[in-house]
């Protein structure tokens, strides 16, 4: 084995060490004192606990097999002192050791994340391992590189990933045989200048660190073939990188680069240069046209933003800060400006002078529904809808708005924008993203007026103002897509934009049942102004994957055009003159719409393109219905993407039980659907989202699509269980979805709208549970709240009391009830839990009658007690009451008509949908 290792590449050495993990320690576990013998030249002690004790035992016994060991794996999830004592014995006992793996990561935390080992240093004696060629210290707690490592002059591969290293020592350059070095996922802020002395280094991985500069000495690594600097903070690169003549792979994505050395494109062996997700705005033509360069996610062709002028701190007074609670829906803005945080998490900042007179701002957070949400064919909704009033009010200075949104699952070639309604049209605002914490993202924008606002994920859009002199528009998501406008193409400047949508090749081949089929990215071109141009415009699209301009069969290539305002795709291959290069196809058009290149042996491509386009917009989901274990009358309904079902169920089944999820169904973004309880089971509440006994949903793929409802039955539960069911039915589709798409997707049969049915069981009531709620409980009529915000009546409070159960003491304390009074209620109703809850809730309510903010206090107490399900039900009751009150005063003519919602009438109640 030793003779073979002399000529192995570093990856082969690492692979040999990894193969050692599959061997086991030959041990006789018959009793204490059993001998532990290595298997051949491999000793693997990381697969079982107690590895250090086993190694110490072997070192003390010195069996002959120990002298043959060349591969040692030892877990670092051990006591630090025991680990240090054990490693100190290694140089004296394992003289032929060539590979030493001291990794953490074998243990996992509660959330499944790999845990780091306890290793913080190495004994100095390890430098005596003269044969050591492979050292793996990954997933540990190293803050500095142990001093013995640079003294291992025979080291060929060094793995330091997932540690806490902030720098590497200058002595690292004294490893003359090193060919493989990885230091990913550390905290490196600088690199040693001696790194350039590693003349034999072939692979270097420094990704996921904090590097902002690279020393020019890195250009001395003449043998380097792979260099990974992804996910750092690099703003520029040294020109010496162009001297790495052996370089084949250079990965620089997810940095802050604004420029790159032009010489990189001339490296003789380079096969991939990854520059995605940087800040590159202008690149030489050699880099733009090179087939091995990846440029997605860069603002190519966009103008640099003007740097903000620093404010004069000495003259700027401190801005007032307002923090609104859940019972407030308005605030006052004065000419001095203010910073406001709404109860829903939204933030606003009004600069001084934004208003000339005091203005009262009202806000409301709407649950999304088609009438309130405007989405393009390939857009996804990421937030609820925020309404700010008064609509259309003009500010003297732009107001800053921060909206929380759901982090998108996929960001490749997509961008997050804030969408607003202005002059009866929806527009996207220039948006910056800010990360407060992992998975807590803000979309920030400047708003000149108030209206409706929502956060949308859309394909990357590139826009320019086209002058009569012509222009070149490139896609930052796919730099190979570009549109060339010749001089004289327009008389007046007009706005032109492009979007590029990708389709997975596997889905296409499954749809066409053809293994060789492929398509180019889908290109959408739009403009403001006349529908056609004065001169033809040249469009460049990349050829479908696997197809080159020199080998393609032209009879299999089709250029498709989607007619505006229709759903049909026309094959216009014979109507345009297609020009081909090795990687691209070029053609000229005078109208803008959707364009798509297909390479297939099929002949009727238009119909297939329509199906493929619809497939891009469909989501495969499953429906679940679960009952709370301690309260079967509480039912959770949710629509989940297929790939999230298992993880969600594993989290919910601790508190819920229920049937298996439904079969997979397909839904469009923004599609309505309903849940109807059947066979003796009904919804036990008057809810604004309950229409004709059915719970209304609107599906948005990135939102939760979940509701918790309470159910009841008119059947006798004292005699037996009530076995009912909940069925899910389709509702209306978004307006942009064509009718033929709806028809093609529906089931054939008597009920084409039915999607799934899941069983629901209300268990038999036993003993005193069979008596009706509150049959022996009587109070005077009670109203909490007011007509504007909504009332809670006696029956509403009884319903709330029936939900609380053993959680009522926590709610009572959050409502401000003294602990001694809580104990007295427990004593007076010690055998009656329902009596305890009702007495607590109604005694509090009687004291609050006529006082403002009582209902908001109750909702806040429920949320603080982790009963958000009951808090949402209270909000739903108030919402319904508020709508009824507003409708009644409109019918009697006591109030003027409010400004209507987009897509709804003034008298129409917006149908709530679950975010």
From Swiss-Prot:
Undergoes autoproteolytic processing whose extent either directs cells towards survival or apoptotic pathways. Autoproteolytically cleaved into two main fragments PIDD-N and PIDD-C. PIDD-C can be further processed into PIDD-CC, a processing which is enhanced by DNA damage. The cleavage producing PIDD-C is required for translocation of PIDD1 to the nucleus upon DNA damage and activation of NF-kappa-B. PIDD-CC mediates the interaction with CRADD and the cleavage producing PIDD-CC is required for the activation of CASP2. PIDD-N remains associated with PIDD-C and PIDD-CC after cleavage. Residues 428-457, 571-599 are annotated as: Peptidase S68. Residues 901-915 have a biased composition (Polar residues). Residues 888-915 are annotated as: Disordered. Keywords: Acetylation, Apoptosis, Cytoplasm, Hydrolase, Leucine-rich repeat, Nucleus, Phosphoprotein, Repeat. SMART domains: DEATH, LRR_BAC, LRR_TYP. One of its GO terms (molecular function) is endopeptidase activity. Residues 585-721 are annotated as: UPA domain. SUPFAM superfamilies: DEATH domain (SSF47986), L domain-like (SSF52058). The modification N-acetylalanine is found at residue 2. Its EC number is 3.4.21.-. Ubiquitous. Its main location: cytoplasm. Residues 793-878 form the Death domain. Residues 327-459, 460-601 form the ZU5 domain. Forms a complex named the PIDDosome with CASP2 and CRADD. Forms a complex with IKBKG and RIPK1. Interacts with FADD and MADD. The Death domain mediates the interaction with CRADD and the formation of a complex composed of 5 PIDD1 and 7 CRADD proteins which in turn recruit 7 CASP2 to form the PIDDosome. This is p53-induced death domain-containing protein 1. It comes from Mus musculus.
